[in-house]
Amino acid sequence: MSTAIAQQKIRIRLKAFDRRMLDLSCDKIIETADTTAASAIGPIPLPTKRKIYCVLRSPHVDKDSREHFETRTHRRIIDIYSPSAKTIDALMKLDLPSGVDIEVKL
C-alpha cells in the first residue's frame, strides 16, 4: 500500500488590465511567501483575454466610419505550497493595488 501525504496548497488567481501593476502584485505575493518559509511557484501567465468594442463615429449617418476599442485582461496564477498560519496572516495583511482582482482558493 502506498501512502500519499495530502499537501496543503493555496492557489491565487490575479487579473488586471495593467500588466505592470499585475507583475508588481505577483512579486509582492511571492516575496511574502518566501519570507514566511512557504514555497511559491509562479507567477504562471495565463492567456490574455481581448475584448473588442465597435462603435459608430457619427451619431446619424456614415455607418462606414467606425471606431474600435479594446480591453486586455492579463491573468496570472501563483501556487503556494505548505503554507503556515503566519503565511496566511501575512497574505491577508498584504496591501495590493485596487486595479488587481484577486481570487484565493485553499
Curated annotation (Swiss-Prot):
Gene Ontology BP term (one): translation
Protein name: Small ribosomal subunit protein uS10
Described function: Involved in the binding of tRNA to the ribosomes.
GO molecular function, one term: tRNA binding
Family from the record: Belongs to the universal ribosomal protein uS10 family.
GO CC terms, sorted: ribonucleoprotein complex; ribosome
Keyword terms: Ribonucleoprotein, Ribosomal protein
Transmembrane annotation, as ranges: none
Family matches, as PANTHER family: 30S RIBOSOMAL PROTEIN S10 FAMILY MEMBER
Assembly and binders: Part of the 30S ribosomal subunit.
Pfam families: Ribosomal_S10 (PF00338)
